[in-house]
Amino acid sequence: MRFMGKNKFHTGPGPSQRQLRVGETIRRALSDVLARGDVHDTDLNRLSVTVGEVRASPDLKIATAYVLPLGGQGKDEVIALLARNKGELRRLVAKKLTLKFAPDLRFQLDETFDRMDETREMLNRAEVKRDTGPVPAGESDTE
């Protein structure tokens, strides 16, 4: 007996190909809506918002958008404005999707750039540079 909801092709811990594809489609649609200013909220339309990633839940009912205001200023304000307008955003994004149900949109701050800065700082430390630098001639780890 087969269960209809089971994904027989995906058994790993990460997202399935469908989740990735739907997330990317939602990201593009949401970016277009925000860039064109289609939302009827002047506060939201005056801000430039970057949608870095959208992760869809396995059942595609929830989509979490990771956003960041251009310049990184007013992060909390952007999340509040997006949450306030999520119904209209959901409707506008759903027009561009070919899914049976429009996913519920949730918004979180995209911290990718902060993590990249931390990684860059770590790689610039003297002890890390020493460990990751070129191996002097005549020395190797395989001896």
Curated annotation (Swiss-Prot):
Q: Major place of localization?
A: cytoplasm
Its subcellular locations are:
Cytoplasm
**A GO biological-process term:** maturation of SSU-rRNA
Chain positions covered by the region annotation Disordered:
1-20
**Function of the protein:** One of several proteins that assist in the late maturation steps of the functional core of the 30S ribosomal subunit. Associates with free 30S ribosomal subunits (but not with 30S subunits that are part of 70S ribosomes or polysomes). Required for efficient processing of 16S rRNA. May interact with the 5'-terminal helix region of 16S rRNA.
> Is the keyword Secreted in the record?
no
Q: How does it assemble?
A: Monomer. Binds 30S ribosomal subunits, but not 50S ribosomal subunits or 70S ribosomes.
What gene, per UniProt, encodes this protein? rbfA
Q: What is this protein called?
A: Ribosome-binding factor A
Alphabetical list of Pfam families matching this protein: RBFA
The terms describing its cellular component in GO are: cytosol
